[in-house]
Amino acid sequence: MANFKGHALPGSFFLVFGLWWSVKYPLRYLNSKVKGNCRSNKCYDRLELIEGILKALFSLIGILAEQFVPDGPHMHLVNGEDHSWVKLMNWQHTTMYLFYGISGVVDILTYFPLNLPRGLDRLSLGIAVIVEGLLFYYHVHNRPALDQHIHSLLLIAVFGCAISIMIEVFMRNDIVLELFRASLSILQGTWFWQIGFVLYPLGGAPEWNQTDHDNVMFITMCFCWHYAVALLIMAINYSLVYYCVNRHKKLPVIVDNGLIKINSKKAEVEASLLAGSDEE
């Protein structure tokens, strides 16, 4: 959709998944470092399954939104009267959602005992991100300078994310790569929203001059600010997860110490009773 909603929708999806990853991966990493932690990986496998279902569901919502909005193509690619293309921008967004939907289906299949190759879920996600980047690279040709530039900045986050995911295919459960991917996903989410605000101002806000070079300079600086905020969010979430994991780790120690004290007092009472009976 060539409007604000068409950018807010994918932005929301990327933001949700980026924020979720910024919590899930530190939680798994820090729990794995807890000595004597006997938790099974089944819990995290279920989370992967839920994540795959949500990814497929969000993709389906995106496809339906792009195709069946009032001014959408309604599954028509070619106009039957003059044989012209019908709403190719909507079709490009639909294609992007399609590949993310495939990634979600692969995540779901990975959960079941089908003996799928290890890393196939990451590979399918990496392909989806590459397709997204390819589509957006040819998305704004012959458009005003600011429009082209703001979309080209998005490609930095997209292809950076793709490279990270492709490395994850061979380096599974690497916390640095996972956090890097999460930060770039948050960046994609917030930047989609920024694109919407710049190209389609809301509430009667003044329109941006698409040919002013100062606007191009500001947008570049603004992109860096967005990533700084994404890194700040990552740091806050990691700190909160670290605090919660450490607090939970200390609870068994406190309980064990309490039981030791109770048992020692019980032993003292029994000893005193035995001593009293011996004297009698």
From Swiss-Prot:
It comes from the Eukaryota. The chain crosses the membrane at residues 7-27, 49-69, 96-116, 120-140, 150-170, 184-204, 216-236. InterPro entries: DUF716, TMEM45. It is found in: Membrane. One of its GO terms (cellular component) is membrane. Belongs to the TMEM45 family. This is Transmembrane protein 45B.
